[in-house]
Amino acid sequence: MSKNYHIAVLPGDGIGPEVMAQALKVMDAVRSRFDMRITTSHYDVGGIAIDNHGHPLPKATVEGCEQADAILFGSVGGPKWENLPPESQPERGALLPLRKHFKLFSNLRPAKLYQGLEAFCPLRADIAANGFDILCVRELTGGIYFGQPKGREGSGQYEKAFDTEVYHRFEIERIARIAFESARKRRRKVTSIDKANVLQSSILWREIVNDVAKTYPDVELAHMYIDNATMQLIKDPSQFDVLLCSNLFGDILSDECAMITGSMGMLPSASLNEQGFGLYEPAGGSAPDIAGKNIANPIAQILSLALLLRYSLDANDAATAIEQAINRALEEGVRTGDLARGAAAVSTDEMGDIIARYVAEGV
C-alpha cells in the first residue's frame, strides 16, 4: 500500500494562483499514473494574507505547514503592499520567516537550457548548442550574511564597516551531503566553489568537503575558485553538474546560472532542512503586471512540484515523468508568450493541460 502524503499549498499573490493551478493539474496526473496518495490543503500567504488576516504569514498557515510533508509555494508581493513597513511586506514578512521557522538551510536551484530554447541563451551559439543542466546547491543560513561581528563604527576618515564570514564544521558537512546526495540522482559530479587561496573559511570548507567526499566514492569531486567559476560558467557551462556553494558564492552563481538560461519562467527552487522537509517555489517573482491575464509561464511552478516529489517524497520516477513531459511539450514547439517570440503562444491554462496530459500518457 502506498504511503499517504500531505502538501501545504500556498499560492500567494500575482501570478501565483494561476501557475499553482497548473501544478495541481500535474499533481493530479501524477496521482493517477503512479498511484500516489497525495492530499493538499490551501493557505493564504503574502499580500492576500495581509488583506484577509492582517499579516503576511498567519498562524493558521504556519500550523498547516507544520502538519504537511512539504510546502508548495507560489509567489508573494505586489504594488498594493509595497508601502507597508519592510517587516510587514509580503516578501520579508512571509518567505523569510518560513525559512527560519522550518530551519531551511539548503537552497537548490536547477538551471537547464532546454532543447529548442537555445536562442534565448545569451551565450555564444556554439556554447549554447552544447546545452547545460546545472544544480546549484547553496548554504542558506551561515556565512558572511549572518556572521558576527558585523556593523559600522568610527567617523570621518576612520569610519569603517565590517562583516564576518563564519562557518562551522556541521554547517559545511550537512550542505556537502545535500550536494553529494543530489549528484547521485544526476550525473554524479560535484564542483565545490571556494576561495581557499585567500580565505580561512574557504580552507576549512575545502577540507571538510574532501572529508565528506570519502563517503561518496561513486561521485566525482572537483574544487574551483569562485572567480574562475564565474568565468567557466560563461565559457562552458556544460562541464558542470552540481555546484556546491557557500551562502555568498551561491547567491552569485545561482543568479548567473539563471541568467544564462534566458528565461526566469523556467526556473524552480527548493529550500530544505535536515529532515528533508522543503519549501518549493519558482525562482521568479509574482509578476503583477501580467497577473490574471492567463499568459504567465507555469513551467517553473510545475518544475517546483517535480523537485518536491524528488526531494521530500522520494518519488524520483514521478519527478522525472514531469520533466520528460515538459521536454516533450517544448520539443513540439508549445510556448507561452514569454518564449514565443512572435509565434503562436498558448495560455497558462493550455500549457498546464498539455503537460498534465503528457505526464498521464507517459513519454
UniProtKB/Swiss-Prot annotation:
Cystine bridges: none
Residues binding substrate, per UniProt: R99, R109, R138, D227
Cofactor(s) this protein requires: Mg(2+); Mn(2+)
GO cellular component: cytosol
Domain of life of the source: Bacteria
Cofactor: binding comment: Binds 1 Mg(2+) or Mn(2+) ion per subunit.
Residues flagged as site, Important for catalysis: Y145, K195
Activity regulation, free text: Inhibited by p-hydroxymercuribenzoate and N-ethylmaleimide, but not by iodoacetate or iodoacetamide.
Known function: Catalyzes the oxidation of 3-carboxy-2-hydroxy-4-methylpentanoate (3-isopropylmalate) to 3-carboxy-4-methyl-2-oxopentanoate. The product decarboxylates to 4-methyl-2 oxopentanoate.
Assembly mode: Homodimer.
Name under which the protein is recorded: 3-isopropylmalate dehydrogenase
